[in-house]
Amino acid sequence: MPSDSKNNYAAVAAAAATTAVAAGAAGYAVYKKMQGYDQTVSELRGNVSHLQEENAHLSRPVVGSMTGDDILLPGEKLTYLKPSNLAERFGKKEHTTPLIEKYEGQLQDFQDEHSIVTQTIYRNKDEHHKQFLRYLRAGPREKVYFNPKEVTAAIVTCGGLCPGLNNVIRGLTQMLEEYGVPTIYGVKNGYKGFKKDNCWIKLDGKKVETIHRMGGSALVCNRGNDDIDVMAEAIMKKGVNMLFIVGGDGTHRGADKIQQYMVKANYECSVVGIPKTIDNDIPVIDDSFGFATAVSEAVRAIEAGYVEATGAPNCIGLVKLMGRNSGFVVLHAVCAAATVDVALLPEMDISLPKLLDHIKQKIDKDGHIVVVVAEGCGATLMQADPNLKDAGGNVKLPDVGVYLKDKIMEFAKANGRNDWTVKYIDPTYMIRAVPANPGDSTYCHVLAHNAVHGAMA
């Protein structure tokens, strides 16, 4: 195993989930025997390396009574995601982690290039010849790339608000201090703050001690990632060599451009992207932070809609929840509430006439109905203008909640049902603004710590 594989693997989107994560791996070669057949990890050009069987033609005994007992079946491949590796450009550097001395030898669970997490352990007989992802596990390394005393770190939060942002800021700051990093900046106002000196503030454990009790972001979020060159130059001018960027897809596109600029400038900096989406629509991880809190708050809104719908005759309780491109918040909240009659997701092809007919049938039968719709359904039910975008580059969605309310009342009037009422609830900003619940708080804590471990590795 080349020793360079132990060096820095931090890169854009490096901090992934609680159980899986890591800052990624450089391409390397390994020869390994696994249950009587040979496998080779071959280094490839580009961003991935494939684990392939050499002797796929050999028959293998099935272990146990069910197909899938083995991690890798004949014809399957494991794919490594390869982020940039600072050691490839600046040479190998190894420093003993200060955590050993800090915890007086009590820290034993170090990870290395052999510690992996596979995308799934679930199998069925039809999944032969599929490709699965493989990641290095998150966690502290015994040897790290950076000398922590020479690190200047910066943290920025971008995009919209999400429960748990302050927990992540707090966790990053505290773990950086654990490593002994002398200078930690918090950059206010998102990417736009990089260009303004008064947006760079010093962080320490005392300043972030209680911010996790509050919603929002102590660093203030903002959208937009223009002037990449100017931002990158400002970052380099401050001497930052460890950058933590918390945000969604638009934010990570910006992070990638910043990292590319630094590569061209031959500037040594570990750029770590920490995924933030309240919609939970990242396929690489099981849950994104803030999602569990959002579902809990969404259930409260649904319960209010149910109370309103059942508390008046011929009433429609209509609740709009977040979900730009996916309906995970709606799906989980609806299942948890167990009081919803119709759930509309962005993944569906929705027929408005059929929906209205169903609402009429339900009201005629029971006198009420509860409908929950994801914001992204506006792209299905209405015509969104692809040229209208927000500062983050996302297409602005028409308000499907108000649209549905109006269409329901138009339908009622056309059918002589002037006794119908619609109680419309849009809790979007209330949900985004709350502090993280205990589950999300714990997740953010571990996620932030692992992001620092990955950046140091």
Which residues does each PLM region occupy?
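Short hydrophobic alpha-helical membrane-entry/anchor segments
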Residues: 2-12, 23-41
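C-terminal non-catalytic interaction/assembly regions of soluble proteins
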Residues: 54-100, 388-457
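Long, compositionally biased, glycine/small-hydrophobic-enriched stretches that function as flexible linkers
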Residues: 24, 34, 45-135, 142-144
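Anionic-ligand anchoring segments at beta-strand to alpha-helix junctions in alpha/beta enzyme folds, i.e.
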Residues: 170-217, 419-422
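Glycine-rich oxoanion-binding loops at beta->alpha junctions
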Residues: 109-147, 193-243, 251-252, 278, ...
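N-terminal phosphate-binding or glycine-rich loops at protein starts, especially the Walker A/P-loop
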Residues: 17-24, 55-92, 143-193
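Accessory alpha-helical/coil subdomains and C-terminal extensions
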Residues: 234, 245-247, 253-272, 283-423
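Short glycine-rich or small-residue beta-strand-to-loop segments that form or flank ligand, phosphate
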Residues: 152-162, 217-220, 241-247, 273, ...
